[in-house]
Amino acid sequence: MLPSSRYIRCAGYEIHCTEWGAPEAPVVIAWHGLARTGRDMDALARHLSSRYRVICPDTIGRGLSQWARTPRDEYRLSFYARIAADLFAQLGIDMAHWIGTSMGGAIGTVCASGLFEPQLKGRIMRLLLNDNAPRLADAALERIKAYAGQPPAFDTVMELEAFFRQVYQPYGWLSDAQWRQLTETSTRRLPDGRVTPHYDPAMVQQFTHHENDYLIWDHYDRLHIPVLCLRGAQSDLVLPETTAEMLTRGPGTRGLLQVVEVPGCGHAPALNVPEQFALVDGFLSDT
């Protein structure tokens, strides 16, 4: 099955998303990581599309979505939640499951808490955090800021693919075809003819102007829905002590949290192989 491509007006911006599956099926929102695009979710969305309507947005400033006019104010979780609320409204979504990689998991957490957008409270049924947690390791955040804030430019797409293979090695196993797709859906050409990753470098202002944006225990503690945290076994962003604390707070104290380590991955599992599909399937279908 091939996805449809949608352009939707959310919070004053044109937001692109790919949509898989039947319109009447239960909805899954699959939201990508910080410097990525919704097309990262293609393999998982294709797998889920026989049973779910899967929506994979490009965050503002990424992929085919518009870039922020005021980066300081709009590259932040509260604005991303506003976009998500408009996405629900524009697409006629009442209830949804949420799968979020890294930043996408944080957006799902703040949406599910209802603190930023009260109209979303109670409308996210299950939350899957793919290598995301309410506190992230400082050293890993510095690493991510370093490569995301100064994206390189190359003469050829093949050079950019080699860069992606290096920087995203912690994703785990990808086939050559998947690396090629990751590259081709993550590339834009600069005015000088070189190619660079497909996002607005100004999005890292989130860390400068909102340095505690990803410290979201107050949102996590308010969750009363099932949560699955997939931690890459070699992740430097989500530490074991953080997942241990998650079990003592919020949904962890209510018997609603599962933590599973994904072998062979760091930050973050690509959600592209049968073993990872099985984890997602089991969580979404668990009643």
Question: Where are the regions a protein language model picked out?
Answer:
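Conserved catalytic-core motifs of eukaryotic protein kinase domains, centered on the activation segment
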Residues: D40-D42, S65-R72, A139-A140, P240-E241, ...
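Alpha/beta-hydrolase
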Residues: A162-L228
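Catalytic histidine-centered segment of alpha/beta-hydrolase-like enzymes
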Residues: C265-P274
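Conserved HGGG/HGGXW glycine-rich cap/lid loop of the alpha/beta-hydrolase fold
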Residues: Y13-W67
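Conserved loop-alpha-helix segment in the C-terminal half of the alpha/beta-hydrolase fold
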Residues: H224-C265
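Conserved hydrolase catalytic core segment
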Residues: D94-D138
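Active-site loop/oxyanion-hole signature of alpha/beta-hydrolase fold enzymes
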Residues: Y13, A43, C56-I99, P118-L120
